[in-house]
């Protein structure tokens, strides 16, 4: 579903542009019609590899942290504010990131949630570090774009959207900071449609904004999710589910707000197109979620809905064919190299997106650029700054090769 070659942009002469804007993979291996074993195919289908992108200060890293909280990867969410007593975030672990409260380098975070294995890449929002974000967008199958509800589409948002569009990366939108004074939600989705050129498909709808923001209405389930705030949003928000006509909902909202919400929900059914997963994956429609990452409102709703719709690993275009992720030939490409991830050891990590097949520790691969055979002895799975030796990985996964590997960004390994 959604893996047609029509979603792939044409390759350009520049290898750097190819890395940013296409699914180009210069494989020269012999064609293989063999596929991975059934158990490995199931593992590949479980993968959801995506990036979170935004204009600076839209709440991207906060949303990342809350997805980890609801995904069970952490028990207590950190904060990106400068208060010393608050816990630091899992994704912003570098000294500069902790000091400035911003992301300056992309971070890989893998965790399991229900039936999915999630590979989440938190990216820098500030334009000074945007090159790192562009490289990451060559390694993902979808992207979550975070919008500030008080500001709407901002310059860096539009710039990153264009990169995703050229690469055929499906976009999911999270309109954040509904707990603050916000622009009218109908105005926001109208702007998104006009500026981005994609059909909006609101998955949920906000119940008020600012201090009056109480939760969201799940349009698919026809349920209202009412939340209670927790200190600093460090824990999961207590949730109460009810029908929109339930007396609990009427009591939680003012008469005026309740009437506004019911009218807007009815209007949406008449003016927006039904959510169509095929159109989402084809880059024609964008699911839209409302919430507050800081207070955990709407985060779980977004996470579960997103994982249902987001694509599993998609193929990449080689010089002669589409590379199927389920082929038994291992292939991958280098999309990022970062030095001094561990200052005590002055190491160098080479980030590889696995495109097809299975990675096994100590396997030998060929660097297609140099023709050299290389043994991958020290591969690691990363969770922010934490590392774990990796014995096996599958198409869709991101691995870090640590050591003196003589690879360059854009290298293909087979």
Where are these regions (language model features)?
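N-terminal chloroplast transit peptides
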Residues: 1-13
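Structural and coupling elements of P-loop NTPases
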Residues: 11, 21-414
């Amino acid at each position: 579903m959604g893996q047609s070659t029509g979603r792939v942009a044409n390759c350009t002469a520049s290898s750097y542009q190819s890395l940013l804007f296409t699914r180009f993979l210069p494989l020269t291996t012999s064609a293989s019609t063999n596929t991975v074993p059934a158990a490995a195919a199931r593992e590949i289908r479980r993968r959801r590899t995506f990036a979170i992108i935004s204009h600076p200060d839209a709440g991207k890293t906060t949303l990342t942290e809350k997805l980890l909280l609801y995904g069970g990867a952490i028990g207590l969410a950190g904060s990106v504010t400068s208060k010393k007593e608050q816990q630091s975030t899992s994704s912003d672990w570098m000294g500069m990131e902790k000091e400035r409260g911003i992301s300056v380098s992309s971070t890989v975070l893998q965790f399991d949630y229900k039936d999915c294995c999630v590979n989440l890449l938190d990216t820098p929002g500030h334009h000074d570090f945007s090159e790192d974000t562009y490289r990451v967008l060559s390694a993902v199958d979808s992207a979550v774009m975070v919008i500030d509800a008080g500001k709407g589409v901002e310059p860096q948002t539009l710039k990153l959207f264009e990169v995703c569009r050229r690469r055929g990366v499906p976009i999911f939108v999270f309109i954040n900071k509904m707990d603050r004074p916000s622009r009218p939600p109908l105005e926001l989705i109208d702007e998104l449609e006009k500026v981005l050129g994609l059909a909006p498909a609101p998955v949920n709808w906000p119940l008020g904004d600012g201090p009056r923001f109480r939760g969201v209405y799940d349009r698919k389930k026809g349920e209202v999710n009412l939340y209670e705030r927790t200190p600093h949003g460090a824990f999961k928000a207590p949730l109460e589910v009810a029908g929109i006509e339930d007396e609990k909902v009427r009591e939680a909202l003012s008469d005026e707000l309740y009437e506004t919400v019911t009218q807007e929900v009815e209007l949406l059914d008449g003016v927006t197109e039904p959510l169509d997963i095929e159109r989402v994956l084809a880059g024609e429609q964008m699911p839209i979620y409302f919430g507050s990452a800081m207070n955990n409102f709407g985060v779980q709703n977004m996470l579960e809905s997103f994982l249902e719709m987001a694509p599993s690993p998609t193929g990449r275009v080689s010089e002669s064919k589409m590379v199927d992720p389920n082929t038994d030939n291992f292939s991958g490409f280098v999309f990022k190299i970062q030095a001094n991830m561990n200052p005590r050891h002055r190491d160098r990590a080479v980030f590889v997106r696995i495109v097809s097949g299975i990675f096994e520790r100590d396997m030998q691969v060929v660097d297609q650029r140099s023709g050299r055979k290389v043994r991958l002895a020290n591969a690691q799975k990363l969770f922010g700054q934490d590392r774990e030796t990796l014995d096996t990985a599958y198409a869709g996964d991101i691995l870090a090769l640590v050591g003196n590997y003589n690879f360059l960004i854009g290298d293909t390994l087979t």
